[in-house]
Swiss-Prot record:
Biased composition, class Polar residues, residue ranges: 530-544, 555-577
Protein name in the entry: Protein phosphatase 1D
Name of the top EC class for this enzyme: hydrolase
CDD domains on file: PP2Cc (cd00143)
Described purpose of this protein according to its UniProt entry: Involved in the negative regulation of p53 expression. Required for the relief of p53-dependent checkpoint mediated cell cycle arrest. Binds to and dephosphorylates 'Ser-15' of TP53 and 'Ser-345' of CHEK1 which contributes to the functional inactivation of these proteins. Mediates MAPK14 dephosphorylation and inactivation. Is also an important regulator of global heterochromatin silencing and critical in maintaining genome integrity.
Catalytic activity: O-phospho-L-seryl-[protein] + H2O = L-seryl-[protein] + phosphate; O-phospho-L-threonyl-[protein] + H2O = L-threonyl-[protein] + phosphate
Cofactor binding remark: Binds 2 magnesium or manganese ions per subunit.
GO cellular component: cytosol; nucleolus; nucleoplasm; nucleus
Membrane-spanning residues: none
A single MF term (Gene Ontology): metal ion binding
Keyword flag Hydrolase: yes
Bias type Basic residues, positions: 579-588
Length: 605
């Protein structure tokens, strides 16, 4: 059937709840090469082809209702001049375009999926027989293009990042491809990214039936299991999922692989066919256990029957059945054309519905991608319903489009927060105009406390010890005296502990400081300084509540009740040493205290 039709294409991808985004999509529309464009040996070099005028020199410049991306590229094919005589055959024949759609779901890294996105279409159209009118030759060329892309990945394996264990990259990807040329649709796929076709059997009935064009390449299929086991591979069930086993030497093995080498069998991949996955190469058979050869099929499009073509990754088909997906797209199109609602595109709607079902089941959403192609007979007022998220194509007008030039990643509402791009300022606080306080080594005290201590140290000590009858200055002098004592301890490099005190204790400390003589102050300094032969064991410092620590500044606090003297200080020092010996009696000596682990303490309140 040589009917005219137009395509409304929408594409959308979402990272879901996964840490990495490994789904990629590709849309390429370009003029189909014809036999007249190829240089003929009979043509003389003195008769070059007429130059193609630039788009700026074209008359008019008006765009059609097929979207800005298509209209800008349609201008590349000039219209024949009204005053000039038409060419014999080239101007009378309108060139058509070929459309290429692909969804690739990567695993083990994004490298294989990205490589397939950039080179798969180029390998397919270079194969001999792809431009043939015979479907069998076209399908053979598509299969050769898949294999050529797979072998090209082998050459790039050294450039791909290695695994965490230092092994070569295990990156691979599924690939579902739809090629539309004229009234023929060619489908090729490897993996579990499916293609669904919506068919309306009765024009009087609004029901559109979903037909699965592809079958997922799962290891549990009898055909795939037989092929895998015939190549020396195996399939193993892990957590309810059948996976292709990766037979690799043990990581501790060095040198060539022999019969005595221990081989680990790891259930690895949940698909039986994919591009990449170079770890599955079998040296005995010379083939890949995870096959890169696709399944191909040919379909003749009828705009009156075929309404939708949906390409999706497993993140979409695991949540939305094919029939539900077709019905959702049909409802979305009815809202757009009948009710005039310009909402989200069909692809975005399907992806959002799938993510919602992932959340309803309380599961971490997988990478989800979808390409929806709406087929309709050629309509004159197609431009009235143009949506910025959709691309409208008429392949007979020879349009050109490449999604790599306009690829924009959309953040997912349920994905891990992405890493900031390099264009943003990596050091916002450093480059900001706000004042940032300098780093000060406060020695376990706040900055304000050190300023107060330094200010008091510069003052005269006599102003601190003079008693006052007024209660408010008395409290201020007491606080300064306590701060001065702490500052003195800091100069002696001794750790101290602050305890809450009331006004009575503060007054007693003020009196003690006033009554102290130079000899008594020297005795207090001797008490604060630990003796040279005193060794603090690790058990004492880390024992926690098992033993009570000695209060070092207790003498100055109790000096009001009993005058301090040098003999009393020596007696107390001897008693402290005796108490420490009794507490450490029976404990095991430690060779190196730094290697000793901390004790676990339990506080019972």
């Amino acid at each position: 059937m040589a009917g005219l039709y137009s395509l409304g294409v929408s594409v959308f991808s979402d990272q879901g709840g996964r840490k990495y985004m490994e789904d990629v999509t590709q849309i390429v529309v370009e003029p189909e090469p014809t036999a007249e464009e190829k240089p003929s040996p009979r043509r003389s070099l003195s008769q070059p082809l007429p130059p193609r005028p630039s788009p700026a020199a074209l008359p008019g410049g008006e765009v059609s209702g097929k979207g800005p991306a298509v209209a800008a590229r349609e201008a590349r094919d000039p219209l024949p001049d009204a005053g000039a005589s038409p060419a014999p055959s080239r101007c009378c024949r309108r060139r058509s375009s070929v459309a290429f759609f692909a969804v690739c779901d990567g695993h083990g890294g994004r490298e294989a999926a990205q490589f397939a996105r950039e080179h798969l279409w180029g390998f397919i159209k270079k194969q001999k027989g792809f431009t043939s009118s015979e479907p069998a030759k076209v399908c053979a060329a598509i299969r050769k293009g898949f294999l050529a892309c797979h072998l090209a990945m082998w050459k790039k394996l050294a450039e791909w990042p290695k695994t965490m264990t230092g092994l070569p990259s295990t990156s691979g990807t599924t690939a579902s491809v739809v090629i539309i040329r004229g009234m023929k649709m060619y489908v090729a796929h490897v993996g579990d990214s499916g293609v669904v076709l919506g068919i309306q059997d009765d024009p009087k009935d609004d029901f559109v039936r979903a037909v699965e064009v592809t079958q997922d390449h799962k290891p549990e299929l009898p055909k795939e299991r037989e092929r895998i086991e015939g190549l020396g591979g195996s399939v193993m069930n892990k957590s309810g999922v059948n996976r292709v086993v990766w037979k690799r030497p043990r990581l501790t093995h060095n040198g060539p692989v022999r019969r005595s080498t221990v081989i680990d069998q790891i259930p690895f991949l949940a698909v039986a066919r994919a591009l990449g996955d170079l770890w599955s190469y079998d040296f005995f058979s010379g083939e890949f256990v995870v096959s890169p050869e696709p399944d191909t099929s040919v379909h003749t499009l009828d705009p009156q029957k075929h309404k939708y073509i949906i390409l999706g990754s497993d993140g979409l088909w695991n949540m939305i059945p094919p029939q539900d997906a077709i019905s959702m797209c049909q409802d979305q199109e009815e809202k757009k054309y009948l009710m005039g609602e310009h909402g989200q595109s069909c692809a975005k709607m399907l992806v959002n519905r799938a993510l919602g079902r992932w959340r309803q089941r309380m599961l971490r959403a997988d990478n989800t991608s979808a390409i929806v192609i709406c087929i309709s007979p050629e309509v004159d007022n197609q431009g009235n319903f143009t949506n910025e998220d959709e691309l409208y194509l008429n392949l007979t007008d020879s349009p050109s489009y490449n999604s790599q030039e306009t690829c924009v990643m959309t953040p997912s509402p349920c994905s891990t927060p992405p890493v900031k791009s390099l264009e943003e300022d990596p050091w916002p606080r450093v480059n900001s105009k706000d004042h940032i306080p300098a780093l000060v080594r406060s020695n376990a005290f706040s900055e304000n406390f050190l300023e107060v201590s330094a200010e008091i140290a510069r003052e005269n000590v006599q102003g601190v010890v003079i008693p006052s009858k007024d209660p408010e200055p008395l409290e201020e002098n007491c606080a300064k005296a306590l701060t001065l004592r702490i500052h003195d301890s800091l100069n002696n490099s001794l750790p101290i502990g602050l305890v809450p005190t009331n006004s009575t204790n503060t007054v007693m400390d003020q009196k003690n400081l006033k009554m102290s003589t130079p000899g008594q102050m020297k005795a207090q300094e001797i008490e604060r300084t630990p003796p040279t032969n005193f060794k603090r064991t690790l058990e004492e410092s880390n024992s926690g509540p098992l033993m009570k620590k000695h209060r070092r500044n207790g003498l100055s606090r109790s000096s009001g009740a009993q005058p301090a003297s040098l003999p009393t200080t020596s007696q107390r020092k001897n008693s402290v040493k005796l108490t420490m010996r009794r507490r450490l009696r029976g404990q095991k000596k430690i060779g190196n205290p730094l290697l000793h682990q901390h004790r676990k303490t339990v506080c019972v309140c």
